Amino acid sequence: MKFLSNLGCMQGRLSPMINNKIQSFPSLYWKEEFSNAKNLGLKFIEWTLDYDQIFSNPIFIKKKIQQIRKLSQKYSIKIKSLTGDCFMQNPFWKKKRHTREVSDLKKIIQACSNLGIKFIVVPLVDNGSLQELWHEKKLIIIFNSLVNFLKKKKIIILFESDYNPKRLRNFIKKFNPDFFGINYDTGNSAALGFDVKKEFYYYGDFIKGVHIKDRILKGKTVRLGEGNVNFKLFFRLLKSIKYKNQIIFQTARSENNKDVQEMKINLKYISKIIKNN
């Protein structure tokens, strides 16, 4: 039952889609999402950060930071995590030269720290996937060089990866567990055909963030319950590791722009599983 008080949604999931993108910062509607989330009984919103016009995002603008704080307090919606789609859109670990990108990363860490955001999700999937060994080596060197800065700013980096369970464990063990962890995405793991029991066996103790979605094996994101995710088993395993952090809905979008209603359907589905598990 504790999980019910940890539910939240990805920013943009309670707003109309922009340019037909499944996920992007809802520049016109981000304020309204606080009241929408409150009305749905959610406790968290996970902030999103795109590479395009990155520093126009409210987390970098003093006046808008104050608005975020006021809305968060007014509607009792916490912002404890940020998904950096900007990293996936412009993966600096695939570049020979990356000085500016690392400088930008430190600015993002600072902005999150200012707002009391604790977790930054770095997606190592799709365009951000570590396809070459040198990508991985470069990423490890860069992020490990930031440990003292992360400690000072009280930030934890969460990697979301397409690595198989054993390989992901070997990867995450190359980082200090006080400042790094894994963001587990239910849908992505199901789409890749991974065995959820093996995943929790190999790296369950490193999971510090969760994205809830459903996907078809090797296929698209679908409404919860219509894909290959075994949510009953997932929540039993999540309970077994004594997971206490936020659980963020990154679910399929409504096909007719009724996103709040779509979230309501998904929330009902997961709430029932949690109560009966």
Language-model segments: which ranges?
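A structural motif
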Residues: L42, I117, I207, Y243-K244
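A short, acidic, flexible beta-alpha connecting loop/helix-capping segment that sits on the rim
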Residues: I248-D259
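N-terminal pre-domain/capping segments
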Residues: M1-K107, S113, S161, R169, ...
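Active-site groove signature of glycoside hydrolases
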Residues: N114-E132, S161-D162
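Charged helix-capping and loop-helix junction motifs
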Residues: F60-Q66, H98-L105, H135-F143, D195-E199, ...
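Acidic/histidine-rich catalytic cores of soluble enzymes
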Residues: N6, S15, N20, L82, ...
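Alpha-helix-loop-beta-strand connector modules within alpha/beta enzyme cores
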Residues: K64-G84, I140-K153, F231-F234
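An active-site-proximal structural segment forming one wall of the substrate-binding cleft
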Residues: K96-F119, L139-L150
